[in-house]
């Protein structure tokens, strides 16, 4: 029977092979790997402006993180087969491991601040498109499992000029140690509420990112006004 302890064991196994910080992602293309290794040799004199076009690419860590979330999410979806797991617990696992939550939020936040935002599959494709600013999105999540009770959400956007020189960054980060959800005797609503905290934590980190992004753009606005 696929109960909570079975789910814990499966999630723990999934964590071993897909932890974002160390996973080897076979699906990463050579072009995707290429973007993960470029590094600015100096800070850029360019500034951010609302009228700019942004070309976005995912870091290697983000590609790995998305695989981790997809694996975790798939386990959560399968956990409801034959009604073996309380629906409230299952739904909490599904909601808190949504692979699209952070990426959609981050891209949406960029779209609110800049004229256009396009996500590219490779650095080559991005550079050929010649956007005004290059953005590398870096994401990291760590969710609860039988072996882990520390939940982490770290999101960062690094901005570069057309020569890949560093302009600045926006970021948000929340880390929290959670009480174990695997203790026998806990009621389903209590377990579901604990698991839901994973999503709340991610949202809090994303809100931090939004505030950081606004501050970065506002700083550029003020610098431009002072220069005129």
Positions of PLM-derived features:
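Surface-exposed short loop/turn segments
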Residues: 26-36, 122-169
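Positively charged n-region of N-terminal signal peptides that target proteins for export
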Residues: 1-5
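A structural "domain/chain start" motif
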Residues: 19-103, 217-228
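Short, solvent-exposed, polar/charged sequence segments at loop or secondary-structure edges
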Residues: 91-140
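Bacterial N-terminal signal peptides
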Residues: 6-16
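Solvent-exposed loop/turn segments at secondary-structure junctions
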Residues: 62-63, 140-145, 174-180
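C-terminal/domain-edge helix-coil "capping" segments
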Residues: 23-49, 163-228
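An exposure/low-complexity boundary signal
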Residues: 16-20, 110, 117-123, 213-228
């Amino acid at each position: 029977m696929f109960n909570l302890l079975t789910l814990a064991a499966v999630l723990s196994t999934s964590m071993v092979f897909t932890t974002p910080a160390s996973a080897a992602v076979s699906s990463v293309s050579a072009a995707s790997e290429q973007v993960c290794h470029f590094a600015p040799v100096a800070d850029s004199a360019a500034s951010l402006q609302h009228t700019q076009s942004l070309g976005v690419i995912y870091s290697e860590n983000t590609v790995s993180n998305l695989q981790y979330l997809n694996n975790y999410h798939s386990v959560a979806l399968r956990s409801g087969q034959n009604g073996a797991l309380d629906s409230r617990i299952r739904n909490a696992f599904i909601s808190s491991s949504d692979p699209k939550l952070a990426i959609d939020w981050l891209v949406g936040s960029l779209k609110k601040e800049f004229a256009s935002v396009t996500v590219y599959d490779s650095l080559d494709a991005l550079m050929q498109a010649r956007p005004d600013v290059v953005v590398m999105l870096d994401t990291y999540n760590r969710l609860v499992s039988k072996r882990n009770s520390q939940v982490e959400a770290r999101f960062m956007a690094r901005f570069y000029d057309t020569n890949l020189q560093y302009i600045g960054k926006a970021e948000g980060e929340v880390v929290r140690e959670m009480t174990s959800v695997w203790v026998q005797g806990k009621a389903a609503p209590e377990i579901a509420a604990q698991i839901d905290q994973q999503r709340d934590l991610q949202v809090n980190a994303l809100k931090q990112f939004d505030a950081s992004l606004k501050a970065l753009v506002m700083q550029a606005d003020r610098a431009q006004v002072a220069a005129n």
